Amino acid sequence: MSKVLVLYYSTYGHVEALAEAVAEGARATGATVDVKRVPETVPAAVAEASHFKVDQKAPVATVEDLANYDAIVVGTPTRFGRISSQMAAFLDQAGGLWMRGVLNGKVGGAFTSTATQHGGQEATLFSIIANLLHFGMTIVGLPYSHQGQMTLDEIVGGSPYGATTIAGGQGQRQPSAIELEGARHQGELIAKTANKLFG
């Protein structure tokens, strides 16, 4: 079976929750799954004063870790319609892996969180996907086989480009059952694809 890395950055825990759901879906296929986060770049005093969720259980990843997986699913909150600076700084350091073609042919996917419905979810997913395509990866999104993203009964995240959640302006809304199911579904599809390609 394949090895899957769920790599994320989360400020208040919303993306962390999606990451765990992505991992659950991937594990359901029999894949070996690790969840890791990128290093925090905000000074500890600022993070504490801003009420960042600093007690996240996932270990911190290194750029070299990326070479050890068949699939890499990347999640980050939106920062003004793009990926967070923490994730950007981490991916920018992967130039050596890119130069050697280490990530070519691996399976990739993206997920995100925004404060509002129209706060840049798809733009952020595209910016993650652009990185993964430059690395030579094959992208798996969240197709409409996840029926939840089509509901009109409640506000939900989700896009064909990846799982998403809407956190609210103060971070007061946690990922809904439908959004977590979308993340699980995407994780399952990514792992199934990697299992077919890498056994």
From Swiss-Prot:
Cellular component, GO annotation:
membrane
Q: Which organism is it from?
A: Cupriavidus metallidurans (strain ATCC 43123 / DSM 2839 / NBRC 102507 / CH34)
Q: Which cofactor does it need?
A: FMN
**What protein name is recorded for this chain?**
NAD(P)H dehydrogenase (quinone)
Specify which residues bind substrate according to the UniProt entry for this protein.
98
GO MF annotations in UniProt: flavin adenine dinucleotide binding; FMN binding; NAD binding; NADH:ubiquinone reductase (non-electrogenic) activity; NADP binding; NADPH dehydrogenase (quinone) activity
The entry's free-text remark on the cofactor is: Binds 1 FMN per monomer.
For FMN, which residues are the binding ones? 10-15, 78-80, 113-119, 134
| Nucleotide-binding in keyword set | yes
Q: Which Gene3D superfamilies did the record assign?
A: 3.40.50.360
Keyword annotations for this protein, in alphabetical order, are: Flavoprotein, FMN, NAD, NADP, Nucleotide-binding, Oxidoreductase, Plasmid
